[in-house]
């Protein structure tokens, strides 16, 4: 048992107060509490305070501090409950305090995993052109329950997936380097896979997108062949042709086009 000997605002924060408790047979105790905790327990000078009540006061203040930390964390963008819990845990809050804070945040709609998941899917498909598989993995990492992930991804229609994947394909086509049609398609396939699009969507987009014209393929082959020629020109002709075929075939060019180029440049030094 003890008695509150003094209550005074702290210099650093006007919303926090020093409380000095004189305890029977023990050193005086000094602690700070939030003004809301002060009002919640109706603390005042001269009030007798038991050890049990003191523990409740300290716990309530821990919850209040963690709640304020959570609000600051949420001020930047929407967060999942898992993100908030991880942030508070990193700040040193015990699980019991985190549970209390999340309960309060849910009641006040500051956290809502259903709304968070739906907004996350909308944002990632529109601003980052991500496919559903990548979005799913990110939501799982953010701790969103499977049921809510399924529910939010149900709004990511197949038509939307196709449209976004086609847009990425067309962008890659405009930036196409001097490469074979096969190499180009494989590069785009890998890009779409990294973006999280399912195989059936990728296959459909690549099938619909078309490839190089024959002239474009020849031009790309010519560029790559000139590069390979500079590497292998010092070899005797049989070895030179073997290495040229191997290098250009690895680049995805057809053997008939490679042989045609070699015939046309048979007299090159």
Curated annotation (Swiss-Prot):
GO terms for cellular component: cytoplasm. It holds the Pfam family RecX_HTH1. InterPro entries: RecX_HTH_1st, RecX_HTH_2nd, RecX_HTH_3rd, Regulatory_RecX, WH-like_DNA-bd_sf. Its main location: cytoplasm. The keyword Transit peptide does not apply. Gene3D superfamilies: Winged helix-like DNA-binding domain superfamily/Winged helix DNA-binding domain. Modulates RecA activity. PANTHER family: REGULATORY PROTEIN RECX FAMILY PROTEIN. This is Regulatory protein RecX. The lineage of its organism: Bacteria, Bacillati, Bacillota, Bacilli, Bacillales.
């Amino acid at each position: 048992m003890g008695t509150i000997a003094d209550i005074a605002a702290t210099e650093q924060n006007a919303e926090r107060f020093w409380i000095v408790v004189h305890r029977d047979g023990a050193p005086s105790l000094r602690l700070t509490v939030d003004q809301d905790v002060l009002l919640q327990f109706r603390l005042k000078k001269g009030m007798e305070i038991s050890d049990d009540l003191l523990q409740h006061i300290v716990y309530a203040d821990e919850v209040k501090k963690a709640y304020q930390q959570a609000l600051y964390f949420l001020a930047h963008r929407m967060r999942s409950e898992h993100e908030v819990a991880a942030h508070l845990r990193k700040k040193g809050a015990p699980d019991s305090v985190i549970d209390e804070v999340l309960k309060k945040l849910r009641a006040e709609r500051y956290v809502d995993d259903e709304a968070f998941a739906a907004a996350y899917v909308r944002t990632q498909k529109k601003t980052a052109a991500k496919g559903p598989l990548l979005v799913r993995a990110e939501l799982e990492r953010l701790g969103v329950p499977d049921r809510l992930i399924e529910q939010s991804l149900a709004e990511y229609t197949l038509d939307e997936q196709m449209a976004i994947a086609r847009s990425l394909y067309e962008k890659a086509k405009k930036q196409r380097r001097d490469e074979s049609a096969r190499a180009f398609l494989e590069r785009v396939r890998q890009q779409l896979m990294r973006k999280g699009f399912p195989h059936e969507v990728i296959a459909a987009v690549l099938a619909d997108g078309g490839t190089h014209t024959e002239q474009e393929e020849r031009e790309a082959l010519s560029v790559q062949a000139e590069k390979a020629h500079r590497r292998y020109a010092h070899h005797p002709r049989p070895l030179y042709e073997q290495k040229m075929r191997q290098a250009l075939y690895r680049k995805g060019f057809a053997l008939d086009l490679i042989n045609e180029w070699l015939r046309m440049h048979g007299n090159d030094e």
